Regions:
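Transmembrane alpha-helical segments that form the membrane-embedded catalytic/substrate-channel core
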Residues: 147-159, 188-192, 253-268, 325-355, ...
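Extreme N-terminal basic, low-complexity initiation segments
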Residues: 2-12
Length: 451
């Protein structure tokens, strides 16, 4: 797979679980059981020009044949469950439908966007230095952390593009930019480049997926993640709302460091992997050939950054460093997990067995969502144009909107876009995407309804 070879703003976010919960309760559409519902007629989708993400109009009805009566439905209305392996176009077919210039990288333009994200991030930091380090100023520090962490996510996305080879044809330059930006956010650049390439090559693969792989009911050891029964029991014990809050805390606050340190939410193939230590006692499966050396090179940058922060703490105090740097970093990490969670998970989006999986089928199980103009600007449309990114990750973000339009127009049967507001979708996923079960008839793993 070619991916294996690639260099791979809002203060209320601190209270995101509670806010999302309230919003979810106010907007329950899509959370109810849909007995006798109708599904999209795949040939009836009509394309609307304008926002490339919002391209699918109301479909004509057809009786469900592939969605169980007890399956919850998202804004996709079960669409992903009707897509068969034979429906998926080849990568060459999709690339042919995308305007040729969208596949080209412009180094100057990429550097300008990198400079914009860097400048915005530095401006936030400058504002933070003016906030007094007093308990009375805590509300201002919370607002600073939320806004700054949201803005810093733009730097994260720039580094993400560098890791994919979407930044520039000058690979040395893009590695320097990506390494510096990711290291500044305590992300091991080359380590994550490798694991993220695996994620792209095995999206929604139940065994070999690298992130957000669910636990399975009646799981087979070594093939599926075990623990589905336990998770469902926990959900029943806490209640749907209670467990949804637990899920939000675990994912948004702990999820990113847990993934880096022991491969949390990964599939069983790669075991307990560590992005900083590519040797035993951790699993080494994720780090073949040249990659252990690259992991160590990533570690040098992280150690250097930690050293700089420690030195700064001796000058201005540990509390000041935590307030200025660690607070925003928590929010940046929250945004990262939020995006990846919602890009590949919803109540009616399946995972696949090895027999049913193909690279392009996994790519077309990615979901585009609306995040609004502010977040789209700050985060370079990483959430609203992610389908095209999974089809060809070398498409730069400034061409992704046009590429998405082409994909949606030419492949409406398989392109997934859910217009549900992101905070409602987040609450729906947190409350209901707990564990999956295998449907032997079609090799799909579907979410077990939570009562």
């Amino acid at each position: 797979d070619p991916h294996e070879n690639l260099l791979e703003g809002s203060p209320f976010l601190m209270m995101l679980p509670a806010v999302a919960g309230l919003l979810g309760l106010l907007a329950p559409r899509g959370l109810t059981f849909r007995h006798g519902a109708t599904a999209p007629h795949h040939d009836a989708f009509k394309v609307k020009r304008g926002d490339p993400a919002m391209v699918v109009s109301e479909p004509l009805p057809r009786t469900f044949t592939s969605v169980a009566d007890d399956m919850l439905l998202s804004g996709l209305n079960g669409k992903a469950m009707f897509v068969e392996k034979a429906d998926i176009p080849t990568k060459a077919q999709v690339r042919a439908a995308i305007p040729a210039h969208c596949l080209k990288r412009n180094t100057l333009k990429s550097m300008i966007y990198a400079a914009i994200s860097l400048t915005q991030s530095a401006a936030c930091l400058a504002v933070g230095t003016q906030i007094p380090l007093k308990v009375a100023a805590l509300p201002f520090w919370l607002a600073y952390a939320a806004v700054s962490g949201t803005v810093w996510t733009g730097m994260w996305v720039v580094a993400h593009e560098c890791g994919h080879g979407a930044f520039s044809d000058n690979r040395a330059l893009q590695d320097v930019v990506g390494y510096v930006f990711h290291t500044a956010l305590l992300v091991p650049y080359f380590s994550w480049q490798r694991s993220h390439a695996v994620h792209h090559s095995r999206t929604n693969h139940i065994t070999e997926g690298e992130t957000h792989v669910p636990v399975v009911v009646n799981a087979r050891e070594g093939i599926e993640n075990t623990g589905g029964e336990l998770e469902l029991d926990n959900a029943k014990r806490f209640g749907k709302v209670g467990w949804g809050l637990v899920q939000l805390v675990l994912h948004l606050l702990i999820g990113w460091p847990a993934y880096l340190l022991w491969g949390a939410t990964g599939g069983p193939k790669y075991g307990t992997s560590n992005h900083f230590v590519p040797v035993k006692p951790f699993s080494t499966t994720l780090w073949p050939n040249k990659w252990p050396k690259k992991v160590w090179r990533s570690d040098l940058g992280i150690l250097g950054m930690l050293g700089m922060l420690s030195l700064l703490a001796t000058k201005i105090g540990a509390a000041a460093v935590f307030a200025l740097y660690c607070g925003p970093l928590i929010f940046t990490n929250m945004w990262l997990v939020l995006y990846t969670w919602l890009q590949h998970t919803d109540v009616d989006v399946p995972h696949l067995t090895n027999e049913e999986f193909t690279y392009m089928r996994g790519a077309f199980l990615t979901i585009d969502r609306p995040y609004g103009p502010v977040f789209d600007w700050l985060h370079h449309r990483i959430g609203s144009t992610h389908v095209c990114h999974h089809i060809d990750c070398t498409i730069p973000h400034y061409h992704a909107r046009e590429a998405t339009q082409a994909i949606a127009e030419n492949f409406p049967k398989v392109y997934l876009y859910d217009s549900t507001p992101w905070f409602q979708a987040l609450w729906r996923v947190a409350c209901n995407c707990i564990a999956v079960k295998l449907r032997p008839s079609d090799g799909r793993y579907t979410w077990v309804p939570v009562s």
